[in-house]
Amino acid sequence: MGSKTKGCCGWLIVALVASLVATAAVVAIMKKKVGGGSGRKLKPLPVPGPPGAIDSKYGDALGVALQFFQVQKAGKLENNQIPWRGDSALDDGKPAGLDLSKGMYDAGDHIKFSFPMAFTATVLSWSILEYGDQMSATKQLDPALDALRWITDFLVNAHPSDNVFYIQVGDPDLDHNCWERPETMSEKRPLTQINTKSPGSDVAAEAAAAMASASIVFKSRDTTYSDSLLQHAQKLFTFADTYKGLASDTYPKLQNYYNSTGYQDELLWAASWLYHATGDQTYLSYVTVENGKAFADWGRPTWFSWDDKLAGTQVLLSRLNFFGSKQTSNAENMGLKMYRDTAEAVICGLLPDSPSATASRTGGGLVWISGWNSLQHATNAAFLAVVYSDYMLTSQTAAVQCSGKYYSPTDIRNFAISQANYILGDNPMKLSYLVGYGSSYPQQVHHRGASIPADAKTGCKGFQYLHSTSPNPNVAMGALVGGPFQNDTFVDSRDNAVQTESSTYNSGTLVGLLSGLVTTSSVAQSFT
């Protein structure tokens, strides 16, 4: 777990400008698609139907990846399938009269950070909404739904009143001074909340996005629960938008762990999901008109991550431009077009032979942005790419234009495949970075529970297991480790947290990526 920055990506700015200029130059030969858009219809494309033949490679990897959510669960476990895990954190929330025992530990430690946990839930919901059929075809939908609800149950309980939300359980400094199994931890676990006097718009808005998106997932499965999630989402969004401020400004110690660099992207992200969940035009106007102009940074897109939601928002809102949105005003349509133009520029920057391709890659072809948790950005980018390619297929949009060159949905999907294949072992190290998949994967994942024998009595000071050079006695199935350095190398050492620590938010988009690659199929034109 480490801090990161949003940072603007110069290649993306160049890509966007080039894309907009080129689009204007050839507008006469561009054919309008459903809901508008700028894809050139070179020839009719078949719209794929329901999932067909399953690619077992990605289906098997999906089954492995989803197990990590079981590994990370806190609380009283139900139908536990991880033999070395047991109940933990049962008293979380009790000082405030709350049950905060559920939720998930964010990475290799035992803190519950609501910010990345909520992001995990949001992208997991998005993955289910886009690729639930693929998950069902591989018998992985129920595990995905179970993981999602385990998080949203926590988020609901962490929101006991309109303007109060608990953003953290545990003391990170104290936790990091211990190396122990979650089942035996005994140190104090204080609660941290945001409220009207101690705001945290970034965390509150991300929680709103999580519960709004999850409300759509559960709408046909549990109406009462779905309605409850939506009510919490709406109240949290109002709270976040009314009492603005960063949680890491309110609580400076957070800057050492999850240092959010802005809350505007979360507000747009949350409002976008609330529009999809409710159809309320107020939310669409929020993201496309005044607040879109103020917060969306059209022309300055960034990498999708737990910190920065703009690229995800751009792709999510582009589906409205691909498939149409009911009763939109001219101003709203213009805003949606700007989101799609920006999303298209992001896609152009990802394609390796595009004129505007980013040079931020390893020699092995992995998109590489940061040394810490390097696979995060590659996984997130590949997820957005496969989603965007499926929007194109479903809307029969034949190509995107990148500085005068055209790229088909297959080209975009091939980029996503390249990143997935790298993760699964097609890389210079010949190593699967998904623990439990393939014949060779990291053996010393930086993970407390996995590194300590289930019957060990360590107390807080089990650091001999951190520094041991032996393989973990317990396999953290489904963990996506941090990943390689820019030279494609990887040091499998438990002390090397930069490369060997895993996180739930990486797993959220990995599940979506693998689900999208299980088989090519059309996506629903509406979530509801």
Swiss-Prot record:
Sites where a glycan is attached: N259, N487
Write out the annotated subcellular location: Secreted
Q: Which organism is it from?
A: Oryza sativa subsp. japonica (Rice)
**Which residues does UniProt assign to the signal peptide?**
1-24
Q: Which GO terms describe its molecular function?
A: cellulase activity
Q: Which domain of life does the protein's organism represent?
A: Eukaryota
Q: Output the InterPro entries linked to this UniProt entry.
A: 6-hairpin_glycosidase_sf (IPR008928), 6hp_glycosidase-like_sf (IPR012341), Glyco_hydro_9 (IPR001701), Glyco_hydro_9_His_AS (IPR018221)
Q: Which UniProt keywords apply?
A: Carbohydrate metabolism, Cell wall biogenesis/degradation, Cellulose degradation, Glycoprotein, Glycosidase, Hydrolase, Polysaccharide degradation, Secreted, Signal
Name the chain's protein. Answer: Endoglucanase 24
Entry's EC annotation: 3.2.1.4
The record's family statement is:
Belongs to the glycosyl hydrolase 9 (cellulase E) family.
Task: Indicate the enzyme's highest-level EC class.
Answer: hydrolase
Q: Which reaction does it catalyse?
A: Endohydrolysis of (1->4)-beta-D-glucosidic linkages in cellulose, lichenin and cereal beta-D-glucans
> By its UniProt entry, which Pfam families does this protein fall under?
Glyco_hydro_9
The keyword Ligase belongs to this UniProt entry's keyword annotation: no
The catalytic residues are D109 (nucleophile), H446, D492, E501
For this chain's UniProt record, which GO biological process terms are given? Answer: cell wall organization; cellulose catabolic process
Sorted alphabetically, the Gene Ontology cellular component annotations on this record are: extracellular region
